[in-house]
Amino acid sequence: MHDNALAKALRREGADCLLQPLYTPIRTDESSVADTHVFFGGVNIYLLDKVPLFRFVPAFLKRLLDRPGFLAWATRRAGSTDAKLLGDLTLSMLSGEAGNQAEEVTRLVAWLRDEIRPDAILFTNLLIAGVIPAIRRELPQAKLVAILQGDDAFLDHLPSPYREQAEGRIGELGRQCDAIVVNSIRYGESMARRLGLDAARLKLLPLTIDTAPFRDFVPKHQRDVRPGAVRIGYFARIAPEKGLHNLID
């Protein structure tokens, strides 16, 4: 939802913005502005990692596994996947051209270089940034920006030694970015220490929502609010990792 809303906002401001799905099609309650084809299709990258002979399967068959409809069906329970079972795959993806998904790295980078030729590329997290070294080599003029958001929740569930190795690799990739965007100073500083990043290079961009749909909303019930009272709106999942309970307590 956030990625789709961000792409919409950039387009409204006149930016030539492409929202490119990785792993699975974009899932959103609103109209999607994402491109229809998927790179690093979730089924393909899993089979490339777990079944060595799969790399010899003809490309046209692999593309069938990247069809949005099939991916949406095959990954409908992806949110319940235990990170503890994905240690090898995580490290392989972070290894980029040295990983088991090297052919997917080559395919994505060639598409960016030959067809898109972007001025800037925004990674919505560093867990998908294994392609950065290849992009740096093939598109040296492109600015690379990554958002740190939620990476810690996934890393926390990786068992040792996968967690430490993944953190080290993510730190290396982050240091190759032109900028790292964070939604809060505290989170940014915490992740900078964890990943070995320079906190001075972090750019703060607080989370927001599009209020346009609510501007004409009239509540059914009006409540008296004492002068000077502060009201806080919370628009997110109610989950421990969001920290709402800390605010309430």
Predicted feature descriptions by range:
Residues L19-A110:
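A conserved catalytic-core segment of Leloir-type glycosyltransferases
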Residues V109-R113, R117, Y162-I180:
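Membrane-proximal helix-turn-helix segments that form the acceptor-binding/catalytic region
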Residues M1, S190, K242-D249:
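Active-site helix-initiating loop/hinge in glycosyltransferases
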Residues R223-K242, I248:
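Conserved donor-binding/catalytic core segment of Leloir-type glycosyltransferases
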Residues T124-I128:
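Short His-centered aromatic/hydrophobic patch
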Residues R186, T208:
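Carbohydrate-associated surface elements
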Residues A120-L122, I135-F154:
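Active-site proximal beta-strand in glycosyltransferases
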Residues D156-L158, R193, I209-G228:
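Acidic anion/phosphate-binding donor-loop and adjacent secondary structure
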